[in-house]
């Protein structure tokens, strides 16, 4: 029912290479209540994403060494140096912008996303990911983070969407994709087929929800 201390609870926690602990009911931020236990995996994408990231870390812990071809397919990991530099620049730009716009409303998400310093930051992170072959900016920290994000993406997203959003605009990502697909097939797992199914089932679930209008 609960793992962690009074002040720091872990809704999903990997213990070493072989144990994965899930609080149930799960309290991961954004997770949904269980209404259909059989199909909950295909409905709660937030919880599923978190679980696959943890499983990715557990898989890496079992490897004797990182996948050399995969690592060589993108830029070298830098322990987050480049990503954190972008974050520091964002903080400076945000501070300067707010000094010029003291009455700005941070509660208006659409307006916040149109601010120049936000657009600049998002574009810079996107470029970091395209050039390095990463899925997220944080993936540039280490092989573990990079592999985990790729695993989560492949097992939960369709090839059509992955190609459009990640492969067509980045040769390093396209190369890493092919390497991982081959890697998992050597273990008898067509991971992209799993991702295609997840996207199909998740879309069915979303379509079944009442309209918000």
List where the protein language model places each region.
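Active-site-flanking segments in enzyme catalytic domains
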Residues: 2-213
